[in-house]
């Protein structure tokens, strides 16, 4: 029994990890189908061993804890999630459970009716056979973010995420920017207070446009519309949310005070629509299992034409009084379920494999497929990741494979249909030389990827390196998008980043779609970017594993480029956040002859101030380890981090014995508790501001 307990607890931990990634970080590592399979396995084990049930199990919970970036909101009526069914058999089992429970209840004394949902027909309601009365309201299951909207006397006063079902995040300012959500309800007989529940989502066209803009600006690309919607709602600046193409459909009511609603769920939705709230027009009343299955098939076929992502339908008992009789389980209502679509899969043939070269030289195999329509999109390639993945699949060129749109977005090969393998398949062999520059390609010990060793000599790496070099957090060169970079490299106008600063108006005007004004603006941006900082310069070089914080630490520690490029591994490891791997990457980068030439060329065109000497007695943060937590008002986290580093501090992401200070913003969370227990000095934001002011000469700004 002990081994079974260990298995169950291990699976619970895995599910909790993925719940956190999905609900809090908006960065899932597995598909919805894979998560559902894990949860189903846990349910099966807990059913077999009920004595091992734990109230904290993922089967008993709704979602992950709310982020600390927004103020918490407690839901007066819990926002529970739904149980899932995945096929007709599962739906019929749900239908049977509902019918049997209502039949068992019908002989008992009627439960007292909620006066808030009475209407004039309620008292005259005749006795009906349970099966005849059982009508379902069927809706689309949007793949977005569930939200709660509170209207008081018709005015929108609060909006919150679902969070863990009992406590969410206050996102009122961001919700007010969504055009489809009315700030005031229209009509008469509005309730004193009503909670509207619905889904915020991003239409597919808006998602594609958002990612296109992000690529042009060298910003983060969202993996799917759901993540884009969630990330947009969690922006601290509502102006950013206002620029995102978000939409909303409501699907129900939570809290109701001082008002009357119909006893039919679909009639309630029609009432909400009359008040000005958006309700999707494909909601349908279905009597009996046959009609529900017909609706399911209809929506499955229409799915690709909707213009937004759905992953199934939602089936709800329409009669609100019957909903009350059926009640709730720990995490979901008994009267509703989500009938999820299977992951979109089709078979096709692998025509070949090409190898793409990334910024750091990683050779990524991409399968070229016989084009196949999948979820409304024509899929003609799939990322194979690395040699280990190819070996796991046992994949060969010419194989027939099952392709799935993971999370309904990213094409991936699920498995090879071995019985369909022809005799003339070809083994996939990783090249020994880069397919672009012909430099040696080799696999580094301990890594799964094979890399081109050509560095910036490689045109493919050069293009990606240039995109990184001009990005906002690097040299911040406005107007230099991906298409322009590709043309500059292809025309051999730019061989390395230093060549950017020798571009002329004539060369720029020879590029496609380049006009005189755009060319001059780009030249102005290039000139402006020549004045930078040592830290930005180091980050812009694109050295593997050297992010903004590490670049800032290196700049602070060495102060001068000459000292940095002469440093050995042991010296580099003395820098905060630099370990063996990063130190070796730095030594290899600065030891590369081509890189040395590029850096020398950049030194001749860029200018950054020498670091100001930091006197220990005047700067209490010097050589101190500082941790930031909670949401800040006077600073952005990046700006404060950079300022602390400039004062000589080492900024860390976690509290440990080495931590000297904890800077706590609003809703600081567990880091503050740990720091307090460890006796670490904690400063709130006002205290920090006063502390920093005391370090500055009079009249200067923090």
Swiss-Prot record:
Q: List the disulfide bonds.
A: none
Output one GO MF annotation. DNA ligase (NAD+) activity
Which CDD domains does the UniProt record give? BRCT_DNA_ligase_like (cd17748), LIGANc (cd00114)
Which keywords appear in this protein's UniProt record, sorted alphabetically?
DNA damage, DNA repair, DNA replication, Ligase, Magnesium, Manganese, Metal-binding, NAD, Zinc
**Pfam families in the cross-refs:** BRCT, DNA_ligase_aden, DNA_ligase_OB, DNA_ligase_ZBD, HHH_2, HHH_5, Nlig-Ia
Q: EC number(s) of the enzyme?
A: 6.5.1.2
Q: Which cofactor does it need?
A: Mg(2+); Mn(2+)
- State the residue spans of region: Disordered: 104-125
- Domain named BRCT is located at 616-702
Tell me the residue numbers annotated for binding NAD(+): 32-36, 81-82, 139, 162, 199, 316, 340
Instruction: Extract one GO BP annotation from the record.
Output: DNA replication
Q: Which GO terms describe its cellular component?
A: cytosol
Cite the binding residues for Zn(2+). 434, 437, 452, 458
Q: Which InterPro entries match?
A: BRCT_dom, BRCT_dom_sf, DisA/LigA_HHH, DNA_ligase, DNA_ligase_AS, DNA_ligase_CS, DNAligase_adenylation, DNAligase_N
Task: Give the reaction(s) catalysed.
Answer: NAD(+) + (deoxyribonucleotide)n-3'-hydroxyl + 5'-phospho-(deoxyribonucleotide)m = (deoxyribonucleotide)n+m + AMP + beta-nicotinamide D-nucleotide
Spell out the catalytic residues: 141
Q: Does the keyword Lipid metabolism apply?
A: no
Q: Which family does it belong to?
A: Belongs to the NAD-dependent DNA ligase family. LigA subfamily.
Q: Which NCBIfam families match?
A: dnlj, PRK07956.1
**PANTHER family per the UniProt record, alphabetical:** CHROMOSOME TRANSMISSION FIDELITY FACTOR 18, DNA LIGASE
Please explain the role this protein plays, according to its UniProt record: DNA ligase that catalyzes the formation of phosphodiester linkages between 5'-phosphoryl and 3'-hydroxyl groups in double-stranded DNA using NAD as a coenzyme and as the energy source for the reaction. It is essential for DNA replication and repair of damaged DNA.
What is the protein named?
Answer: DNA ligase
Q: What's the source species for this entry?
A: Hamiltonella defensa subsp. Acyrthosiphon pisum (strain 5AT)
